[in-house]
Amino acid sequence: MKMDELFEKIIFHALKRHATDVHMKIDQQLDIEFRVLGKLEHYASYEIDIGHKIMNYIKYKSFINVNYKLVPQTGAFHYFIDNHIYFLRVSFLPGEHFESIVIRILNNHEKLTINELSLVKEFSGFLASICRQTSGLFLVSGATGSGKSTTLYAMLDRLIEMGGKNIVTLEDPIEMVKEHCLQIEMNEDHGINYHDSLKQILRHDPDVIMIGEIRDEKTASLAITCALTGHLVLSTIHASTALLVIKRMLNLGVSETDLEDVLIGIVSQKIKYDLKRKRVIILPEMMSRKAIMQYLHHDDFSYQTFKQSALSLIAEKKCDSYILKDELNEQ
């Protein structure tokens, strides 16, 4: 079998099983698993020579250097199958006795509105209120695969629908193509990075700036500057809770005064899996500008935590309590 045919077969079956990720590992043989509703399921095994060939095929498609076999690398590419285009994000990791590739499958044609993101009714209203702002910094946090990009793209759709705004995005990589947005893909190898690109787009008269991720002090500082100069800035950051987002920004050198001036909202989100109904639930916690200010001033503050969102879902009979047991046990 040709490698393009084998790859198409693997992706076809992954999509059929609604997998979010494809795991491939070569040791004595090639083992392939799909992540379905949070759990890994075995799909197939192949002889080791086929394993090396399909791995090299995937590396080639995703612009991963096949000569650097001992170096972890990432890549990505768009893939057309079954009349749809999917964005495939690839991670290659070498071990002492094995090679591993994980492919994240991102659905380019499935567009969720902010009203469809979560069963938590307060979530859409909170995001809509952020979209109505003309300036400030809004941050979305969560673990890898928690839907941060999905939330930002849904907000972009709402902003596009509102009209009258020049929207520029900086992404690494571009996961979903949006009309009526100027999308710029980061490429460190060619000198295209968040810091330098942010400085450039400020001359492009933007109203809204989406930054794929705040990952270093330079990007954090420029994001603050953009928000201070009258732009609405949306971005993601790695932190597990809303409060840790604030601490993360402080650790990146942002002053409390600047956070008070520009941070208009925080969402931290988790993915929960309802195996009985075979669905994915985005569970958010939401921190408003008022709560952020109270926290920074060491006053009493309150915001919608994961536990409160979980209790809301249970009270409205939208979710069974056993799915949210970890959140319900939070102090």
Annotated model-derived regions:
Residues 1-331:
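Short, flexible helix-loop junctions that flank or precede catalytic/ligand sites
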